[in-house]
Amino acid sequence: MGRGLLGGLWPLHVVLWTRIASTIPPHVPKSVNSDMMVTDSNGAVKLPQLCKFCDVRSSTCDNQKSCLSNCSITAICEKPQEVCVAVWRKNDENITIETVCDDPKIAYHGFVLDDAASSKCIMKERKGSGETFFMCSCSSDECNDHIIFSEEYATNNPDLLLVIFQVTGVSLLPPLGIAIAVIITFYCYRVHRQQKLSPSWDSGKPRKLMEFSEHLAIILEDDRSDISSTCANNINHNTELLPIELDTLVGKGRFAEVYKAKLRQNTSEQFETVAVKIFPYEEYASWKTEKDIFSDL
């Protein structure tokens, strides 16, 4: 009977304690162990720090730019307010690195941890007795594993490659664009000039007697012509205009075109079939070269 009554009153007891706890004013101080619970500036509970913790170990790290502690032990700091600390020493015998947790309110090796709020462990030289002494502290997890000796390196290193690529791209983009534009312009000029030097002549229309003033040079192919020797001897191939009527296009090359033509004999209706090679005015040098060759034969 008694146990049943107590069992029925237990839920009521829990509800009453819940109601009482909810009515406690927020300004009433609560008993909390300050060593076990620390809050940040926003009022959030701060958890203990994760730091490299290898005490003192020999190292090959020099005090140039940055290096790693090579500590394989990661420890949870004993108190939430403790931060990560790294100490680099160099004396006549060896180089050592020390990685520990420590409270920034307490001096370490006689020096105040004035950089405890930093997220990176940037070394600062301290005046030690008979040795080179650097120390740093930081407040991010395992931040004392990567120790940095140059503030400039610490500032630029994370985005160093990105900055280099950006600067290089911005620097090279204008010259590259100009170079591409020059290449395209030169290519278009070459294509246009070649088309101008080798025009597509209309071969569908029969060509009439052409004069030298029309910028065309006409050469009579003596060795392939059936013209009579009397007519051929009476013609000066170099200075006289020939009574030629072009017939059909036989072939076309890079520098000239070859036509089948009719060589009129005086004013009569008689003619001889000849081959005529025609050079455009722009290919005067090629025409002169061939003329000199045939003149020497």
Curated annotation (Swiss-Prot):
One of its GO terms (cellular component) is activin receptor complex. SUPFAM superfamilies: Protein kinase-like (PK-like) (SSF56112), Snake toxin-like (SSF57302). It catalyses: L-threonyl-[receptor-protein] + ATP = O-phospho-L-threonyl-[receptor-protein] + ADP + H(+); L-seryl-[receptor-protein] + ATP = O-phospho-L-seryl-[receptor-protein] + ADP + H(+). The lineage of its organism: Eukaryota, Metazoa, Chordata, Craniata, Vertebrata. Residues 244-297 form the Protein kinase domain. PANTHER family: TGF-BETA RECEPTOR TYPE-2 (PTHR23255:SF55), TRANSFORMING GROWTH FACTOR-BETA RECEPTOR TYPE I AND II (PTHR23255). Phosphorylated on a Ser/Thr residue in the cytoplasmic domain. This is TGF-beta receptor type-2. Residues 24-166 are extracellular. Its EC number is 2.7.11.30. Its main location: membrane. The gene is TGFBR2. It comes from Sus scrofa. Keywords: Apoptosis, ATP-binding, Cell membrane, Differentiation, Disulfide bond, Glycoprotein, Growth regulation, Kinase, Magnesium, Manganese, Membrane, Metal-binding, Nucleotide-binding, Phosphoprotein, Receptor, Serine/threonine-protein kinase, Signal, Transferase, Transmembrane, Transmembrane helix. GO terms for molecular function: activin binding; activin receptor activity, type I; ATP binding; metal ion binding; transforming growth factor beta binding; transforming growth factor beta receptor activity; transforming growth factor beta receptor activity, type II; type I transforming growth factor beta receptor binding. Belongs to the protein kinase superfamily. TKL Ser/Thr protein kinase family. TGFB receptor subfamily. The chain crosses the membrane at residues 167-187.
